[in-house]
Regions:
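Primary mode marks residue(s) on the alpha4-beta5-alpha5 output face of response regulator receiver
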Residues: 1-80, 87-180
């Protein structure tokens, strides 16, 4: 892309998992449900939808909206949590956001009119040399107007799992198990 510098850093690993809801059982996501997390342009559009979460492997509880500087042997990680609540009827909306919501951070409850669905979490790990981290020589976004802000981290998801598979995922999550 124009005004980009450097090259693409490929992930060392990617973990995709579904998580339950702290308050209620989850229902299966409908096929083709669309979800967004984060915002590609929070500098120009404002921070309301930004959800950047960065950490280092082995430091899961230390989350930041800044690029981390990890200790030697630890990987830089992007943690992307998608909404875990759904309006129960729409697989998309005009803004691609209002048909889904995040659970309340304090109570874990979905907003009124929403039901809990398996919450998708994607953890992307990168092997980035510590000296590169210390010099601030890695960046994420490719939008010049965002100044390579780590706060612009974002992702899109469309559920293409079969109905049968989503029923299995919901049952597994509701039973509190880790399922392959």
């Amino acid at each position: 892309m124009p005004n980009n510098t450097g090259g693409i850093v490929r992930p060392a690993s990617v973990l995709i998992e579904y998580r339950g809801n702290a308050v209620s059982k989850v229902v299966p996501m409908p096929k083709f449900l669309r979800e967004l997390t984060g915002d590609a342009k929070p500098t120009s559009r404002g921070p309301a939808n930004a959800r950047a979460t960065w950490t280092c492997s082995g430091f899961d509880g230390r989350l930041s909206d800044k690029y981390p500087i990890c200790p030697e042997g630890s990987r830089v990680q992007r943690v992307q949590d998608f909404p875990g609540c759904w309006d129960g009827k729409n697989t998309d909306s005009a803004d691609h956001r209002s048909h889904v919501a995040f659970a309340d951070k304090t109570t874990g409850a979905c907003p009124d009119g929403f039901v809990a669905i398996p919450q998708l979490r994607i953890t992307i790990s990168y092997d980035i040399a510590r000296d590169v981290q210390l010099r601030g020589q890695f960046v994420l976004d490719s939008f010049p107007e965002e100044n390579h802000n780590p706060f612009s981290d974002h992702n899109d998801y469309i559920n293409v799992n079969s109905e049968r598979q989503m029923v299995k995922i919901a049952a597994c999550v509701n039973a509190g198990r880790r399922c392959p």
